Amino acid sequence: MARSLWKGPFVDGYLFKKAEAARGSSRSEVIKIWSRRSTILPQFVGLTFGVHNGQKHIPVYVTEEMVGHKFGEFSPTRTFPGHAADKKAKRR
């Protein structure tokens, strides 16, 4: 179920402050965040965020198409090891 419109998008307070500080500084550095639940806002376009996936921070460069999505959508948490090899085919 979608979030009701009267509430507006959810963004952690510290995240908004970090983005504003990074926008003001001249050097471009990765902003480390743990808030995968936060919505990407238009103010974040052009910034690089390090989104935590449980082990490490995955760098995510925010583009216009990402606005309205959540940060967690762009940082996968599970690694797919592949399907098990067929033992019969391996012996041949």
Curated annotation (Swiss-Prot):
GO function term, MF aspect, one: rRNA binding
InterPro entries: Ribosomal_uS19, Ribosomal_uS19_bac-type, Ribosomal_uS19_CS, Ribosomal_uS19_SF
A GO BP annotation: translation
Keywords, alphabetical: Ribonucleoprotein, Ribosomal protein, RNA-binding, rRNA-binding
Disulfide bonds: none
Entry superkingdom: Bacteria
The keyword Iron is annotated on this UniProt entry: no
GO (cellular component) term, any one: cytoplasm
Pfam families cross-referenced by the UniProt entry: Ribosomal_S19
Gene3D superfamilies: 30s Ribosomal Protein S19, Chain A (3.30.860.10)
Keyword rRNA-binding on entry: yes
Function as written in the Swiss-Prot or TrEMBL entry: Protein S19 forms a complex with S13 that binds strongly to the 16S ribosomal RNA.
Family membership: Belongs to the universal ribosomal protein uS19 family.
Protein name: Small ribosomal subunit protein uS19
Species per Swiss-Prot/TrEMBL record: Methylobacterium radiotolerans (strain ATCC 27329 / DSM 1819 / JCM 2831 / NBRC 15690 / NCIMB 10815 / 0-1)
